Amino acid sequence: MAGCKTMLSSLELGKLQREQHAHDMRNHFDIVSLHKTERLKHYGLHFAKYVGRLARESAEAKPVERTIVDTLLVGLSTANTLHQDLSNENISSPSRLKQIDPLRIFADAAGRFADACEKIDHLEEFLPIARQANHDILCWVITAADERKFDLQSAIRARRSELASRHFYIED
């Protein structure tokens, strides 16, 4: 996979991935408790939801930046479920970035991820497709954040804190 400039190094992504596991164990145990194939389908639905948010543009109440951060968080959780070690991957812009509409890159990858999830039910090979689609989604996230010039790591910390506050009854 070709490389390009990114806002996050593979080591930083690996650290975020490990932190996401701890976050998920604390705040999303209902999802972590699902069978891995059901978890992947759940994440596929999230990706589809986020493509829809972005497609609605100004008709969507949630800001684009929040959707980008949410997509990254789900991508990290997805990588954990797929045993996809992001610290060993070159997360960069996909070559298809030259398309007129960059949303198509995300939609394409989300569609391929859905295809992988469907293959689970047919007992067909799905892991390589799911891993590549998740990789491409993460590339899209990095590029989208870079284009908007916002700090993903700070945004991730803020979003995780917001999500954790919903579980006021958990003592750390």
List the model feature ranges, each with a label.
Residues 1-172:
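Flexible "arm" and connector segments at domain edges
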